[in-house]
Curated annotation (Swiss-Prot):
It catalyses: a beta-D-Man-(1->4)-beta-D-GlcNAc-(1->4)-alpha-D-GlcNAc-diphospho-di-trans,poly-cis-dolichol + GDP-alpha-D-mannose = an alpha-D-Man-(1->3)-beta-D-Man-(1->4)-beta-D-GlcNAc-(1->4)-alpha-D-GlcNAc-diphospho-di-trans,poly-cis-dolichol + GDP + H(+); an alpha-D-Man-(1->3)-beta-D-Man-(1->4)-beta-D-GlcNAc-(1->4)-alpha-D-GlcNAc-diphospho-di-trans,poly-cis-dolichol + GDP-alpha-D-mannose = an alpha-D-Man-(1->3)-[alpha-D-Man-(1->6)]-beta-D-Man-(1->4)-beta-D-GlcNAc-(1->4)-alpha-D-GlcNAc-diphospho-di-trans,poly-cis-dolichol + GDP + H(+). It comes from Schizosaccharomyces pombe (strain 972 / ATCC 24843). This is Alpha-1,3/1,6-mannosyltransferase alg2. GO terms for cellular component: cytoplasmic side of endoplasmic reticulum membrane; endomembrane system. Mannosylates Man(2)GlcNAc(2)-dolichol diphosphate and Man(1)GlcNAc(2)-dolichol diphosphate to form Man(3)GlcNAc(2)-dolichol diphosphate. Its EC number is 2.4.1.132, 2.4.1.257. Keywords: Endoplasmic reticulum, Glycoprotein, Glycosyltransferase, Membrane, Transferase, Transmembrane, Transmembrane helix. InterPro entries: ALG2 (IPR027054), Glyco_trans_1 (IPR001296), Glyco_trans_4-like_N (IPR028098). Its main location: endoplasmic reticulum. The gene is alg2. SUPFAM superfamilies: UDP-Glycosyltransferase/glycogen phosphorylase.
């Protein structure tokens, strides 16, 4: 159904605008939280929303999905998400293309489609007439772990597909100014304007009574909290180092403090296990006693001598109680894409101490609802000391200011209205002439993707034979021929799209 018909229909017969989301894996994470919040928000504005995904486990998803608040369609879960723990981006792309084919052949009634994380499906969607909005949490090429020469060669076609498919979207939206700057660096040839729609937090959550009560012995301490997954890139070590620096400034009163290190922890993830051990060893180096809690939340016991309390994979109700009872949130990640945790803390009137880079530059107003300081443990320790022992900072007023700031700027309604504005302006921008050009672009891009896929497969297939040829030299000519054929196909694909992009100024 065409966009003109859709808009005309909605304006005359009051039929709601229909919106589809395409998301790879609808689990529990920041990207998934945004999709859920956006879907719920758009529904509250009268839109009909369906989320399409390749995987959704009802035992491991957000409540709005589990209770049916959001309509979810799952297709392609039977396809592998990886092959022997590898080729995950290849499998994810394949699953998304399959999902897109189902959507295009069975669900043609949508007015707009929002794609996030993976953009492989965008060229295929151009074959229809729906407006396409791509939401970039962070460029995938920078998220992927880099390896040796083979990994770099493997990533080339997928990084190229990401760049060329993203540029075909009608609207490109990012989650922060920081991500926008990284996006421009990652894709310098994309000239389309970038819109910013910040993630949101549940404003009503702060007005509800806490469902969990911390033990009195913990509440008697001056609590500082760090909430992050147990990953090195989150730089939790900085919080412990700053806490140690606090002792140098206030040795006599230091026993009054307790550092809470809470976050996502999966024992199956080796990095989680290793990093927790590193942090515990760092506590020992700094002569800080610690206790680790991973269950039995109703009976948390902490000795008076404990300085650091590690809390692994805390339930939401416990997490809310921990944040609400803390004096300061120590938000340690460097160059974080956006950062939801600072918003959650400010909503509960807890000031935030963060680094002078990344997403917090857009959420933390230095001196008003928190502090922005360089990565220096002594500087951080001094801020903690002054905020908790002197009148230098009115932390109560900062907490109130932070709560109002979040309620006004980062509510679900505010985010939904920004999405609605981008969607409606995108729909109106698609003229009949533009629709024809979109389909031409889509056909060409699908052809290039098809060629890239088979060319890459041919090249990949020759690698094991190239190794075998060391023992069976007679097969080398066939291997060489196959490698050359695959290389030619990939090269022609790149050349075709490059020339076309230049001619059409994509």
């Amino acid at each position: 159904m065409s966009q003109e018909n859709s808009v005309h229909r909605s304006s005359t017969k009051k039929t709601p605008i229909k919106i589809a989301f395409i998301h790879p894996d609808l689990g529990i994470g920041g990207a998934e939280r945004l999709v859920v919040d956006a879907a719920v928000g758009l529904q509250s504005l009268g839109k009909e929303v369906v989320v399409f995904t390749s995987h959704c486990d009802k035992k491991h998803c957000f409540e709005e999905i589990r209770d049916g608040t959001i309509k979810v369609k799952v297709y392609g879960d039977w396809l592998p998400s990886s092959i022997f723990g590898r080729l995950s981006i290849f499998c994810s792309s394949l699953r998304q293309v399959y999902l897109t084919m189902i959507l295009l052949t069975n669900y043609m009634h949508f007015d707009a489609i929002i794609v996030d994380q993976l953009s492989t499906c965008v060229p295929f969607l151009l074959l229809a007439s729906q407006m396409i909005l791509f939401y970039c949490h962070f460029p995938d090429k920078y998220l992927a772990k880099r390896g040796g020469i083979l990994k770099k060669l493997y990533r080339i076609p997928f990084d190229t597909v990401e760049a060329e498919s993203v540029r075909l979207a009608d609207r490109i939206v990012v989650n922060s100014k920081f991500t926008a700057s990284v996006f421009k660096k990652a894709f310098p040839k994309i000239r389309k304007p970038l819109r910013i729609v910040h993630p949101c937090v549940d404003i009503e959550a702060a007005s509800k009574p806490l469902e969990f009560q911390l033990p009195e012995k913990i509440l008697q301490r001056k609590l500082l909290i760090s909430v992050n997954r147990f990953e090195r890139k989150k730089d939790i070590r900085l919080a412990i180092d700053a806490f140690s620096a606090l002792r140098d400034l206030s040795a006599n009163r230091f026993p009054e403090y307790l550092l809470l290190v809470a976050g996502g922890y999966d024992i199956r993830v080796s990095e989680n296990r290793r990093y927790l051990k590193e942090l515990q060893e760092f506590c020992e180096q700094k002569d800080l006693s610690y206790t680790t809690v991973k269950d039995n939340w109703d009976n948390i016991t902490v000795a008076p001598s404990t300085n650091v309390l590690f809390l692994l994979s805390v339930p939401s109700k416990v997490r809310d109680a921990l944040i609400s009872s803390s004096r300061i949130l120590l938000y340690t990640p460097e160059n974080e894409h956006f950062g939801i945790v600072p918003l959650e803390a400010m909503l509960r009137k807890v000031p935030v101490l963060a680094q002078t880079n990344g997403g917090p530059l857009e959420t933390v107003i230095d001196g008003k609802n928190g502090w922005l300081r360089p990565r220096d443990a002594k500087i951080w320790g001094n801020v903690i000391y002054e905020a908790t022992t002197s009148t230098t900072y009115d932390t109560a007023a900062m907490g109130e200011a932070g709560s109002e700031w979040v309620k006004n700027e980062f509510s679900t309604d505010a985010m939904a209205r920004k999405f609605e504005s981008e969607i409606m302006s995108g729909i109106r921008s698609i003229t009949p002439e533009k629709r024809l050009m979109r389909r031409v672009n889509g056909l060409l891009a699908v052809f290039v993707l098809f060629m890239l896929f088979w060319g890459t497969c041919i090249i990949a297939a020759t690698v094991p034979f190239a190794i075998i040829k060391l023992y069976f030299a007679q097969t080398y000519s066939s291997v060489k021929l196959g490698f050359m054929l695959g290389t030619c196909i990939v090269s022609v694909s790149f050349l075709t799209f490059t020339v076309y992009a230049k001619l059409t100024n994509l």
